Amino acid sequence: MEIRTFLERALKEDLGHGDLFERVLEKDFKATAFVRAKQEGVFSGEKYALELLEMTGIECVQTIKDKERFKPKDALMEIRGDFSMLLKVERTLLNLLQHSSGIATLTSRFVEALNSHKVRLLDTRKTRPLLRIFEKYSVLNGGASNHRLGLDDALMLKDTHLRHVKDLKSFLTHARKNLPFTAKIEIECESFEEAKNAMNAGADIVMCDNLSVLETKEIAAYRDAHYPFVLLEASGNISLESINAYAKSGVDAISVGALIHQATFIDMHMKMA
């Protein structure tokens, strides 16, 4: 969904048929407002906020940038426009910034806990309907990378696919003839044997799903000895407390759905000058 379309729908959702305050406002006037943080975090949502302000005729006097850290009471944005319009966009603007910054802030905590320049932290497709682009953009601002945006990015075979595949190697040979040349094939594995079979069958990426650190290390050792070109990804209930141990297991990437679905709004408010 285009950013402008997304924002128009978000604003329409809040405005309905119009802000009733306009009916009782005797005279409109120019006003200045500040968006301030009420807790610390990592700023995200700048691109969406600026587009929202532009489409509603509000001037952004000053803003901090995506990926910048902030503290309580910091001024994040200074905006100026018609008093009535500032009030119209207030909740939509805050929702965007709070949600996006919440994801970026939690993601940054996982990046810090990961503590590795070699292992990439990835998000997942566990996103809210119609918010995937927005939420994955927020993950990038927190310092992680995106996994697949959709089913058309790469072929990923999970247990629900594999239970109907009798010969994995033959299936992958068939798949490569029908996929774009650049498309990767990733296979989700829940044991050492499944990971070994996936590598032997020709997978580009093997996901170690819900495996212990020790099991993941064993798979990484086998990969290093026999298929060093295969990428390994760890996934499944990996927390802030366990992510560093998985980073040391020999994998190339770690995917964490919690970056998005466990993130909470960062508290902010907008006040008139």
Curated annotation (Swiss-Prot):
InterPro entries: Aldolase_TIM, NadC, NadC/ModD, Nicotinate_pribotase-like_C, Quinolinate_PRibosylTase_N_sf, Quinolinate_PRibosylTrfase_C, Quinolinate_PRibosylTrfase_N. CDD domains: QPRTase (cd01572). It catalyses: nicotinate beta-D-ribonucleotide + CO2 + diphosphate = quinolinate + 5-phospho-alpha-D-ribose 1-diphosphate + 2 H(+). GO terms for biological process: NAD biosynthetic process; quinolinate catabolic process. GO terms for molecular function: nicotinate-nucleotide diphosphorylase (carboxylating) activity. It is an enzyme of class 2 (transferase). One of its GO terms (cellular component) is cytoplasm. The keyword Transferase applies. Pathway: Cofactor biosynthesis; NAD(+) biosynthesis; nicotinate D-ribonucleotide from quinolinate: step 1/1. Its EC number is 2.4.2.19. The keyword Transferase applies. Disulfide bonds: none annotated. Substrate binds at R91, T124, R125, K126, R148, K158, E188, D209, S235, G236, N237, V256, G257, A258. Pfam families: QRPTase_C (PF01729), QRPTase_N (PF02749). Keywords: Glycosyltransferase, Pyridine nucleotide biosynthesis, Transferase. SUPFAM superfamilies: Nicotinate/Quinolinate PRTase C-terminal domain-like, Nicotinate/Quinolinate PRTase N-terminal domain-like. Belongs to the NadC/ModD family. Involved in the catabolism of quinolinic acid (QA). Hexamer formed by 3 homodimers. This is Probable nicotinate-nucleotide pyrophosphorylase [carboxylating]. It comes from Helicobacter pylori (strain ATCC 700392 / 26695) (Campylobacter pylori).
